[in-house]
Amino acid sequence: MLVSDFQFDLPDELIARYPMPERSASRLLMLDGNSGETRHGQFRDVLDLLQPGDLLVFNNTRVIPARMFGQKASGGKLEILVERILDDHSVLAHVRASKAPKPGTQILLDNGFSAKMVARHDTLFELHFAGDLPVLDILNQIGHMPLPPYIDRPDENSDKERYQTVYNQRPGAVAAPTAGLHFDEPLLAALREKGVDFAYVTLHVGAGTFQPVRVERLEDHQMHSEYAEVPAEVIAKINATRERGGRVVAVGTTSVRSLETAAQASLKAGKPLSPFFGDTSIFIFPGYQYQLVDVLITNFHLPGSTLIMLVSAFAGYEHVMNAYQEAITSGYRFFSYGDAMFITRQSL
């Protein structure tokens, strides 16, 4: 297949630049992966759609305030977007400047903080921060929430809460696992009371999630790498869910990629399903056979993105593209702060 197969025209006014006042008040488009049938509702309808014994798998990463503004000692301004924290004093980052900094360049930041560019790794720059304060503390003082480019506005105080899931635990993402933004505490409590089980993977979403696919044939695309963890507790819960006839419900494409990475690594090693800790660059597109996920809760994704390809592999290309056109006609809100889908997997 070609990247152009996944393009669609989206009116600018359907790009959500702010979240809904209530998390669970977003709209929900339900898609049956077998029939292609769609239904419309509100996100809190997931309480009726999920059954006792189902397992919700969340990504518990926490978005860090990864964007900083500074200048070189020579006066040139630059913008830094941290991609990954290497240790307490070093990061890998994207740097936007009129001229790329060379190794040894001093970068002056707000509040008297400074960093030095020590090495370049492809498109990323390794920066070392001066002083005793850990990088995460510095970011919490002077960093901005790294809103996606299509939101097209400066970050505001409210984004510190709303561009973050209510169940986040592990700092490290530079983009939110956006399907999880719709869950609020009352909905989570009601799901628990109904008998829906919860499990947590970690995938620190990188800025690469917003990078366009620059080749035309899907097979030629090199996926960006992100760190993921699928602990033993999650494996045990998946096995227990399977035994009782429940469904594994992935909240977001990052949960999907984490779970399917663990499944593929286990298959490759010739072992039963096992925990996974490491980098993943799994690229899921039509033709992929899902191993673990039965239901996907996800937002509406960018035209031509790897994420709409992942969803198309889950529910069938034509079903997904038709559902997207229906969402556009019905005025659904798109992307990170937008509405959601509840999708059952297409049987092969």
From Swiss-Prot:
One GO biological process term: tRNA wobble guanine modification
Gene Ontology cellular component annotations, sorted alphabetically: cytoplasm
E.C. designation(s): 2.4.99.17
Keywords on record: Cytoplasm, Queuosine biosynthesis, S-adenosyl-L-methionine, Transferase
UniProt cross-references to SUPFAM superfamilies, sorted A to Z: QueA-like
Subcellular location, record wording: Cytoplasm
Keyword S-adenosyl-L-methionine: yes
Entry-linked Gene3D superfamilies: QueA-like
UniProt keyword annotation of Metal-binding present: no
Coiled-coil region(s): none
Pathway: tRNA modification; tRNA-queuosine biosynthesis
Protein name: S-adenosylmethionine:tRNA ribosyltransferase-isomerase
Protein species of origin: Tolumonas auensis (strain DSM 9187 / NBRC 110442 / TA 4)
